[in-house]
Amino acid sequence: MFTTYSSISSQDLTIEHWQKIAPLRARLRAILMASTLFGILSVEMSGTALAVCEGPGAPTTTQTKCLTAVQIPGNPLQSYDISWVNPDRAEYYLADRSNAGIDVINTQNLTFKRTIPGFVGAKLNANGTVNNNISGPDGVVSHGRWLYAGDGDSTLKVIDLNAPNDSAIKQSISTGGTTRVDEMALTTDGELLLAANNAEDPPFATLFLANGDGSSSHVTALTKIIIDDSIVPAGFGLSMEQPAWDPKTERFYVSVPVIAENPPDCNFDADSGPITCDGGLAVIDPATLAGVAAAVLGAFDPATNTGVVPLHACGPNGATVGVHDNLLLGCTPANNPSNTSTLVINATTKNFANIGNIVGSDEVWFNKGDRRYYTASNRNCKTTAPCPTAAQQAAVLGVIDSTSVLIETIPQSSGSHSVAADSKRNLVFVPQSAPVTVVIGGDTTNVGAGICGSTNGCVGVFIHDVKKDRDYHDRNRDR
């Protein structure tokens, strides 16, 4: 007597089950063409079994493979933003504007847990597209039991993950703007949080005292930080994007998509023609801000390792800290049409290297479990670079090793710009947009539906079998 995988419910499946199923899936497809085949890796939705991990988004030749898809109840995924993983809690969090809440997925058995409500949701323009600047939730990070999420009404929501939905939001703190609190970062101990109001003009960041490992919420806004007007001039819609915390230098590093005079006489006014200015990296030392209600960040000062570092050939969105205090920055032609690569810069020396054949990233993530960077590159070049227009771009999941070498790219649904990884399980989570036939501004390809096995959008789950790769390299090392 034996147990078939199709008889196991999705809630019973652990990572170990999924790993056993994956190699069987390909073999059984060659033997069986009946519909029962799809019970091996399927999801249930409205009573219908749906095949997942099909098509261009599930190649069999890559090291990073599509494992399954987690369906999100409620409205189809039209608009979502940043995602995060807390590996100690085995939880993935997605800022889901389409359902006006934070989706929570169990990363151990890969099942949907709940959506935490209380956000403004997707606010629409007259043509039905989403106005990202006033929609929410947006940025999200977590430490221990505490989840922090930005909302479209310029508030920071503080969520107790141990609480039920109706009492999960413990604080809602205004940053004093009129647009969204966007991307953010925590110190390693969870005691300080930096969040950017990217859509304000001029943009600003807020430094908060956070909850750390405390059992009650006492989050307090400490300092409002702007960048000097000579670097980020007001009135031109310039921005601040993803912060990241580097524990070695004890600094926050914030992506600044476009800065003036970089290079000299460049154009930073989108209304006057294509942007030709590169971006910068803002370096903030929170230790210097004690008791300071408002601060202005100027040009970079090597003596203090603070200020704005001009970047070359990069207008960054995402930022993440990897090995050796290197930061990977998601350069994108959405900020500077001439961008063709991804940048890695050392937090201490500011030495940098460009990674070719991958560009157009929003959120980027370093997974310490397999020592790889993952990029949500929704504006990667389809063929040759540069690729300044949307017609020349396509969404991919970029995979980069710790030596800053591109390993592979995997197609994703158009607009896919969010990624997070579970370092304990080496799972990578990538939200997929619902098709354009279902939602305005949705996926214009068949990639998302193939990954999801549905037309509602989903969270695609990818796996990197570290042991298999190491065994392969060991066998071939001396050949």
Q: Which residue stretches match the model-derived regions?
A:
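C-terminal segment of classical bacterial N-terminal signal peptides
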Residues: F38-T48
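Predominantly soluble domains enriched in secretory-pathway, periplasmic, or organellar proteins
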Residues: A49-R479
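Sec-dependent N-terminal signal peptides
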Residues: P23-F38
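N-terminal secretory signal peptides that target proteins for export/translocation
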Residues: M1-A26
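Intrinsically disordered, low-complexity polyampholyte segments enriched for Lys and acidic residues
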Residues: D12, E16, K20, E44, ...
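Aromatic (phenylalanine/tyrosine) cluster motif
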Residues: F2-Y5, F38, Y472
